[in-house]
Amino acid sequence: MSEFITVARPYAKAAFDFAVEHQSVERWQDMLAFAAEVTKNEQMAELLSGALAPETLAESFIAVCGEQLDENGQNLIRVMAENGRLNALPDVLEQFIHLRAVSEATAEVDVISAAALSEQQLAKISAAMEKRLSRKVKLNCKIDKSVMAGVIIRAGDMVIDGSVRGRLERLADVLQS
């Protein structure tokens, strides 16, 4: 867990509440995603860790973001710069996405398989997870050859390991005990 998670929550909550009030949740998520990527830039990271005045830092950051930030997004950047919190932007984005998922009653589900799954297989997994979690799900599919066959499904703290690799590991544990 990131060191900035506690710092990020109030900024994410304020941004999310504002976005909901102004019916611009998608726009805000896009702005935060862009700003979070800017913080990961090597040159910007040097500026963020430097001794620039908050006003100068905020204006430099806003200049780099250009038209990706609207006036309200720029205001958030200024407030975060004043408080020395621009490094927390990736965590603000993460918290914002979490608040959005809770608000929309959706859950992110990672599906890891050895090969690409068919639309029919994805539909079955989606339906089963929606029933199990009692909410809509968004599937994030990844291919990992080490799975060998089967799938690994992750939703929050829940992990369903139906992979051959997982079965072999469990069998090895039983044989060694």
Curated annotation (Swiss-Prot):
Alphabetical GO biological process terms: proton motive force-driven ATP synthesis; proton motive force-driven plasma membrane ATP synthesis
Species this chain originates from? Escherichia coli (strain K12)
State its role. F(1)F(0) ATP synthase produces ATP from ADP in the presence of a proton or sodium gradient. F-type ATPases consist of two structural domains, F(1) containing the extramembraneous catalytic core and F(0) containing the membrane proton channel, linked together by a central stalk and a peripheral stalk. During catalysis, ATP synthesis in the catalytic domain of F(1) is coupled via a rotary mechanism of the central stalk subunits to proton translocation.
- The name this protein carries in UniProt is ATP synthase subunit delta
Any single GO molecular-function term of the entry would be:
proton-transporting ATP synthase activity, rotational mechanism
Keywords from the UniProt entry: ATP synthesis, Cell inner membrane, Cell membrane, CF(1), Hydrogen ion transport, Ion transport, Membrane, Transport
What single Pfam family name could you report for this chain, choosing any that match? Answer: OSCP
Instruction: Indicate where this protein resides in the cell.
Output: Cell inner membrane
Q: Tell me the domain of life.
A: Bacteria
UniProt family annotation? Belongs to the ATPase delta chain family.
Q: Which InterPro entries match?
A: ATP_synth_OSCP/delta_N_sf (IPR026015), ATPase_OSCP/d_CS (IPR020781), ATPase_OSCP/dsu (IPR000711)
GO CC annotations on file: plasma membrane; proton-transporting ATP synthase complex
Assembly and interaction partners: F-type ATPases have 2 components, F(1) - the catalytic core - and F(0) - the membrane proton channel. F(1) has five subunits: alpha(3), beta(3), gamma(1), delta(1), epsilon(1). F(0) has three main subunits: a(1), b(2) and c(10-14). The alpha and beta chains form an alternating ring which encloses part of the gamma chain. F(1) is attached to F(0) by a central stalk formed by the gamma and epsilon chains, while a peripheral stalk is formed by the delta and b chains.
